[in-house]
Amino acid sequence: MTGEGRAPYEVLKVAAASKPVSVAGAIAGVIRSQQRVEVHAIGAGAVNQAIKAIAISRGYVAPVGLDLICVPSFIDLTLDGQERTGIRLLVEVR
């Protein structure tokens, strides 16, 4: 996904086994440098970890005056040769 005249977003893939604190650090790092990031998750467990990570990352970037918004959408991904529907969470600075 690209914005108007913007380069493609950096994509972070989250699994059910991902640690939210680690993902939050990655999200905060990309947000600080690029102002936006896409988080992809397939399955309820992965979506849960991704949402927790986004909430944690808000706490990491808020002290420097950055407020995050999250825009969810569906995405079709190919995983091991199979089409899967996942969730795309676009995280941007408001």
Q: Model-found features: residue ranges?
A:
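Short glycine-rich, basic-tinged beta-strand/loop micro-motifs
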Residues: 30-48
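Generic structural hydrophobic/aromatic packing signal, biased to beta-strands
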Residues: 12-14, 27, 50, 54, ...
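Flexible, active-site-adjacent loop/turn segments at secondary-structure boundaries
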Residues: 12, 40, 59
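Short, hydrophobic/π-rich interface segment
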Residues: 44-68
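C-terminal edge-of-domain segments
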Residues: 62-94
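Residues that cap or initiate secondary-structure elements
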Residues: 18-20, 45, 76
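An N-terminal amphipathic alpha-helical segment
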Residues: 4-35
